[in-house]
Amino acid sequence: MIIIAFSILDFKNKEAQNFDFKAGTNLIVSKGNTKGKSSLLKSMYYTLGFDVHQFPSNWNINFMYFQIEVLINNVKYNITRQKNIFRVSDVEVPLNVKEYSEWLQHKLEIKMQLANTHTKHLYEAYSSAVILPFYIDQDDSWDGGIYRNVTNTLNQYTRIPADIFKSVFNLSNYELLELQNSLTNYSKEKNTVVSTIKSLLNVLEDYRHENADVPTVSKIDKIALNKDIDRYLQMQNELNEQIVKYKMKLLNKQEMLDLQKQELSELEQLLKMNKKRYNSIETECQYCHSKLTKEQSLTRLDLSNNYFEISLLKEEIEKEVVKLTNEIIIFESQQNSIESKIDEIHRRIQNSKDLLTIDDYVKATAKKEASNELESLVDKQVLSKYNLEEKIKVLRREINKLKKEKESLREIIERDYTDLVFEIKKVLNDLNDTKLDLSELNLDELKFLEFKKISGSGMDKNKKFLAYYLIYFSLLRKYSSYIIPFCMDSFIKNEITGETAKKMFEAIEKYFFDTNQSFFSIVSENLKHLEFVDSYNKINVEGKLLVRDKYDEIALKFKFDS
């Protein structure tokens, strides 16, 4: 992404302004502080979708329209924001924050998902999370921990900002979780198929046994009995097929019911264990009577040792047990009804000795057809089992491959992180290659993807914050799955000496400014510390940020059809 231009319209005070930017380094310059630099930068990233925690006291965004022109993958878009309503140039209707966040992720070709604090379920991340790694706020980014408590929007997510950076660096485990969920589903489906095959084979064996006792019909007057044979054969065959189906359904449902009851029993034991907090309590399998530890039950049921999770699954299984029990009752009733009809046909056949031969013929033929149908069903289930096993093999290979790729990538990034810690220490401590005492600035308190509170005070603390931000900007430049223009508001929060300022600006110029677009606020007095200052685009902010004579011209940009 590249920011081309930015417009502000204050419709209450009838003031406006427009700013144009370049693709490289953009310096927001003023002669002193409180001249509007922060208002400009905060408003720009607010328009992009970052919910800024606080604006300057004299900057009331409730009476302002903001519009930013950006280039994403060589396509230009206009993004307009007023409070929590967004308009984008390629969508006709206004968007809320959630809809805009989805639009932004789609344009950046990413899929960032974060876990909700309460439900632990994954949701598509809001735009504030997408922008967070690239924006350093003047007021909220320089205290506590890096990238923490910068916006209230992110309080809904767990493990922030670590999970955001894992997603940005393609280190997130959520891809693995999706594959593992698919693997679990396929494995469960395979187990169901295996159970179905077993049930079918049992029914088939019963039919073969029954069919062996049926006498073979050798002589039948087909011409005389043709109509009766066709009629009774069709009736008998249809009813027997229905009986087979209901037997199969009953066997499958009973198998599922038994499994659900077993899982319910184990869950009840787990809940008791969880409440009593026993470390190792055995429970007994209701079928094989083997002892199951709490961990084995948790593993078999694919659960973590969480009381609420176990309780929720127990409720779901109890509902499933009731549902299966009711279905079995219905199927038994329907089967009994059909069997009554078959008995009625048998009674009619037996009433006439002339139809005895037909009765034997119908029974033998119907049982043969039922046996063939069962064999066909077994073949289909065996094929389904084979296909599922192949899918499981493929998924396991993908999971193992992805695990290795992520582990390897993390090792590479961690090595770069360690190297950057050493390099930036040298710059900020003003050390040469022969002086190896790096004790002046301690950057060893945070490992890669650790975002704990940073110790220290005064300029020492400022230097630590700056160093860690520069480390992550360097890593973003090299490993991020997407790029948003870098932004760093003023980092000088305390008195600073000339030499210290020189080293800090040297580090910024080396590790923050680069070929990608960046925005940096600076007072004109400190421009002398930048070696390549003449090559940077400067936006001078003096006096009032907004002016009346630009209002009518810029207001035309905010005319919407809808």
Swiss-Prot record:
Gene Ontology biological-process entries: defense response to virus
Keywords (A to Z) from UniProt: Antiviral defense, Hydrolase
Superkingdom in the source lineage: Bacteria
Alphabetical list of InterPro entries matching this protein: P-loop_NTPase (IPR027417)
Gene null: resulting phenotype: When this gene is missing the Lamassu type I system does not confer resistance to SpBeta in B.subtilis.
Gene Ontology MF terms: hydrolase activity
Record function comment: Component of antiviral defense system Lamassu type I, composed of LmuA and LmuB. Expression of Lamassu type I in B.subtilis (strain BEST7003) confers resistance to phages phi3T, SpBeta and SPR. May be an ATPase.
Stated name of the protein: Lamassu protein LmuB
Lineage per the UniProt record: Bacteria, Bacillati, Bacillota, Bacilli, Bacillales
Gene designation: lmuB
